[in-house]
Amino acid sequence: MNAITPRITIDGDDMDFIEGQYESPGNLGSASLTFHLPLSYAGDKKLWNKEVLFYFNKQDSSPMFRGWIRRTKVDLNQVEVFAQDALSYAVKDGGTSIAQLHLSEQDNLDGLSASAAIKEAIKRCKLTDKLGILGNTSPVVSSVRPPYRGTIQLLELIKSLLSKAVLNTSTIPRPNIARLIDNGNKSLLLIELQADLDNGPVVHTYTELNNILNINIVNRRLPSVVIVNGKGGVAGTFSHDTAISAFDRNYLTVTNDSLESPAECLDFAQKLFKANEAVQYEYGIETLEGAYLVENDVIRVETDDPKFAGNFRVIGKKVNFSPSSFSIGLNINRKPPTLAEYISSRDN
């Protein structure tokens, strides 16, 4: 394996770690860092909730991971440390109370853009010391319709606001996504359009002969019945008899408030089915290249079978490392943008 010089700090102090693993699932899931320290670091909870930074190379100006220690485990030889990033405060597996806020008729987020509403929600959840926001949706959408009321989990609010913004100016609609970045001082939730596989720049190319150690290909189940809900209660349903015969009834339901008639909803549903039909493969790649790839980057995979080759989006990443070696795992797919996990839907 190639030599690297990874670095881990806890509250600014460099750690003499033994080995570790960084894992980011993507799709607004919380990234984690698990690493092992010599037994001399053991102590009764003395590491809990301290800030951890992981640099893939010690020369990097910004960390690959910024998070907080959730738990430690001591055995006879070492201490295992588990940390999660800022999104862990908003997800169920965060090891802490889930961030939420209460909105009423008198105190709410009405009239704010999606970005401004998310920023205010983060402030109300008292997470501004751990999480900021950068960018806005394209097109810009408001938090007015429908109005948000009651007790709402922060992550569900973010997903709901993002699902309202779909850029429908091309053959395949493109939604907005959010992912964590680091500016060297703080984690930021970056809002951006999901990458265009056909026209976006290819960041890296993988081939079976040169830089792929192992590859797993998954043939996804296609949605055979697509239901699209539009504005003011209009809706359209598209079903495909051949797909139903092959995959049974696999439902997909999405909402697009820019559609104002049943005909527009039906046309949108047909686009979703056709997009799924053409790109139903997902990959898991083991490699030694691509440590700095991030979610939404476009890469190209070249295989002997052309139906498995083409451009893919990076979804998640795993890096196993020690002071002198590393390996990388990438999760990539061509799942049509409007089927992303940011829209509350079922697509597998």
Ranges and model annotations:
Residues 75-78, 82-217:
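Charged- and aromatic-enriched interaction segments used to assemble
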Residues 15-17, 24-30, 76, 90, ...:
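A broad, structure-centric signal for solvent-exposed, well-ordered loop/edge residues
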Residues 1-114:
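Beta-strand-rich assembly/attachment modules of structural machines
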Residues 23-41, 77-89, 228, 257, ...:
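Oligomerization/assembly interface segments of phage tail-like spikes and tubes
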Residues 4-16, 57-63, 157-173, 205-209, ...:
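Short, solvent-exposed secondary-structure boundary motifs
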Residues 10, 18, 24-27, 41, ...:
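Intrinsically disordered, low-complexity segments enriched in small/polar residues
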Residues 1-2, 107, 159, 163, ...:
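Acidic, small/polar-enriched beta strand-loop surface segments
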Residues 56-84, 172, 299-331:
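Short beta-strand and beta-hairpin "edge-sheet" elements
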